[in-house]
């Protein structure tokens, strides 16, 4: 998935309340440098051929996301986390050598380690390419394009982008079509947290909503009062659903 553009003023469509254009850029302080990372170490493993998704390669058969599958032999590593999880990191061989590949991987892994385990639990691989393209989630994976990553890092939104993409990877398949989530959507009377979620309710509503609910519950003091009020007014039933998921995954 791509990320919606930085939010404009709140949108009103008829009786529906949609407070944000997209939620990734609502706050760059949901996770920050003060948060601990569960990432502990990175181990080089033998390079082997892998199938990776690269957004720089056009596939005209897809109308929602630029990119295509490629088969290459990337630099391979295993990342270890203190909660016992492991992730295979696949770094495109366009990077100069093992040292550069490892350096680039490390720049993201500490941030990924800040994500709650709930958001990381289905992440089995990470793909890292050059290029200024959207990040992606799903496929038990996090997709990174390094030039865009440097922009997110500069602007302070790298953690929030990973929250969004990891929600796709670890939460979509469990919740996007669940009875409880659909009932919560209906009970919110046509409201969505963002214009992006409303446009793609099956594909984006989970990833747009869960990170802000996480912020409400665990990082509330980092959100502006106006933002809190907008979230709570727009999607009270989705908030209850998210909180029940957090409680059951403690």
What are these regions (language model features)?
Residues 1-23:
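Bacterial Sec-dependent N-terminal signal peptides
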Residues 10, 41-142:
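Auxiliary, metal-adjacent structural segments of Zn-dependent hydrolase domains
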Residues 114, 118, 165, 169-173, ...:
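Structured segments of extracytoplasmic/periplasmic soluble domains
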Residues 125-127, 143-145, 171, 205-213:
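Structural recognition of the beta-strand scaffold that forms the well-ordered cores
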Residues 132-135, 149-152, 168, 176-177, ...:
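Solvent-exposed loop/turn segments at secondary-structure junctions
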Residues 144-163:
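Short pre-active-site segment immediately N-terminal to the catalytic Zn-binding motif
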Residues 159, 163-181:
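Catalytic Zn2+-binding segment of zinc metalloproteases
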Residues 184-250:
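Metalloprotease/metallohydrolase-associated module, dominated by Zn2+-dependent proteases
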